[in-house]
């Protein structure tokens, strides 16, 4: 598993909260987001046998940063520290005198994103062909951390998720759907297809996968349903 990989010792657990705002994890308020993520991080650290943990926010997510900054944690007001230059989480563990810190950084895009994320947050370089676990780091997303919190503290199974829709001007930016719901049902519930739709994409435009049918279901890993305009679709001419 991610938390206890065979033959590897996890010393640090990271919750990657740079990919979406607090509402994307089914939280009622930013304050609830902060308190529940801290509790989830404790659970993850215990499961992994890790001594250190950090929640990584996106530097331009002002609402989430404000929510965490107002929390009283371990007897003092929590501070969200920026990852700048050589100041990685190791610096803030010592500076704040805590084994759990909350930091912020810009969102990272591209291939091997988790390896770059690990280096940017911890300063540990992940060798080519290896994973963060090889340098003692386990990474968990907000949705998985929220699901763990709900299961342990509320006895609630993971059967629904929040996804966003891109390319539908008349649709809410975030919708709560049951896992297994076909894409077409989500689209119809949000007012139907746009007048012109060139491509249906699961997840974002940058890293998503084009779908040949709207019968595909929403899964635990679905974060977005995107629509690309016909003029934006690249079509190579046949030779």
Which functions belong to the PLM regions below?
Residues 1-16, 21-25:
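Hydrophobic alpha-helical hairpins/lids featuring a short glycine-rich hinge
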Residues 25-26, 66-67, 113, 211-214, ...:
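Short, well-ordered secondary-structure micro-motifs
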Residues 30-48:
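Histidine-anchored nucleotide/phosphate-binding helix
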Residues 159-161, 183, 188-239:
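Ferredoxin-type iron-sulfur electron-transfer modules and their immediate structural context
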């Amino acid at each position: 598993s991610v938390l206890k990989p065979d033959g590897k010792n996890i010393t640090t657990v990271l919750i990657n909260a740079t990919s979406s705002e607090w509402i994307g994890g089914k939280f009622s308020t930013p304050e609830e987001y902060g308190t529940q993520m801290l509790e989830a991080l404790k659970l993850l650290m215990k499961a992994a046998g890790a001594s250190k943990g950090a929640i990584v926010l996106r530097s331009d997510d002002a609402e989430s940063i404000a929510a965490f900054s107002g929390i009283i944690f371990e007897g003092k007001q929590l501070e969200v520290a920026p990852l700048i230059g050589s100041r990685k989480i190791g610096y803030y563990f010592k500076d704040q005198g805590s084994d759990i810190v909350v930091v912020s950084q810009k969102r990272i895009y591209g291939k091997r994103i988790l390896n770059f994320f690990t280096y940017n947050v911890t300063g540990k370089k992940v060798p080519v062909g290896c994973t963060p676990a090889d340098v003692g780091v386990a990474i968990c997303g907000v949705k998985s951390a929220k699901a763990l919190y709900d299961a342990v503290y509320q006895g609630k199974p993971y059967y629904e998720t929040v996804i966003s829709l891109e390319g539908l001007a008349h649709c809410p930016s975030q919708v709560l759907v049951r896992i297994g719901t076909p894409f077409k049902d989500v689209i119809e519930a949000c007012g139907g297809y746009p007048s012109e739709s060139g491509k249906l994409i699961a997840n974002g435009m940058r890293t998503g996968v084009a779908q040949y049918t709207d019968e595909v279901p929403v899964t635990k890993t679905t974060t977005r349903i995107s629509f690309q305009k016909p003029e934006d679709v690249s079509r190579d001419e046949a030779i």
